Amino acid sequence: ISVIELDPNRNILRHQKVIEKPYHMSYPFVFRERGSYYMIPETASNKTIELYRCTEFPDIWEFDRYIMKNISATDTTLFYYNEKWWLFTTLDQTGGISGGSTELFLFYADSPLADKWVSHPLNPVVSDESSARCAGNLFIRNGIIYRPSQDCTIRYGRGFYLQKVTMLTETEYKETNEKKIKPEWKKDLKGTHTYNFINGLTVIDVYTYHRRF
């Protein structure tokens, strides 16, 4: 996991590695709680959901705890709503056949630093490779909850949806496809699978192919 610092014109000032492990890490979900920054990176290849605490922002992060172990979870995302913390994650229970993009599981707790998370009774709350896997932070716009989700049909990172969450309680969960975003705004783009924004800055990733010769 690395950090990149930008100037006001979005030019890169520096980049620095902040967490390195002998297994794959990606999708760094960052949040603030009790005056500290925390991060949940994807560590599915280690069969864990891990929590890190920042001791010197943004460069120094220390392992805090395992949120869950013996679990193949991808793109874990937290969301605070109605005095509960909700944990969204896609679980691969097929031994790697599904790739961890088909089933969305939901858990909840009173604190993001909780030792135990309660599994939602409707799990998996979504079973659809076109919309199960999270693509960024959930957000509220005009009173409506939106969940960015990856479209993993045909290939990984094909595009993403904005899902409208219409019901989120300890016993119910409902969402509908609101809008699909494809990488069509520039020639030669092949895919996009992450959407986030904060303080007026929107970040969308894309990938393309380049000839090496």
Stretches with model-predicted labels:
Residues 1-213:
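Carbohydrate-active catalytic/glycan-binding domains of CAZyme proteins
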